Amino acid sequence: MADRKCLALIAHDQKKNDLAAFAKAHEATLSGWKIVATGTTGGRVLDACPGLDVTRLKSGPLGGDQQIGALIATGDVDCLIFFVDPLTAMPHDVDVKALMRLAIVYDIPMALNRATAEQLIDFRRT
């Protein structure tokens, strides 16, 4: 299964548990994907779903968002799920905006909340 699609998972601190729960609810579907995630988010997903193929990159504020952006730019990420916390100020907000911009520029599907992620996963499953 060398040509599996790659999904990037990111969540702000207050949304990490929500993303881990989302991954658990869709574990069977996600098992067909190669997953890249920022460090702490990837750890939470692996705690919830130890059988998933998750590559943990750096923490978002330490460059993980930019690492995922680079993977989008090289065509190595096919889809982005990023659970954003709109109510908390982020010191690395410019990195987040740059990441979203790359997802738009390279026209990959992007979900920024659970409702959209649910639709995206259902669509990608078919």
Swiss-Prot record:
GO MF annotation, one: methylglyoxal synthase activity
Catalysed reactions, as listed in the record: dihydroxyacetone phosphate = methylglyoxal + phosphate
Binding site for substrate: H12, K16, T38, G39, T40, T41, S59, G60, H92
Class of enzymatic activity (EC top level): lyase
GO terms for biological process, alphabetical: methylglyoxal biosynthetic process
Any one of the GO CC terms: cytosol
Annotated active site: D65
Entries under Pfam families matching the protein: MGS (PF02142)
Domain MGS-like: 1-126
Domain of life, per lineage: Bacteria
EC numbers: 4.2.3.3
InterPro entries: Methylgl_synth, Methylglyoxal_synth_AS, MGS-like_dom, MGS-like_dom_sf
Keywords annotated in UniProt: Lyase
SUPFAM superfamilies: Methylglyoxal synthase-like
Protein family membership: Belongs to the methylglyoxal synthase family.
Reported function: Catalyzes the formation of methylglyoxal from dihydroxyacetone phosphate.
UniProt protein name: Methylglyoxal synthase
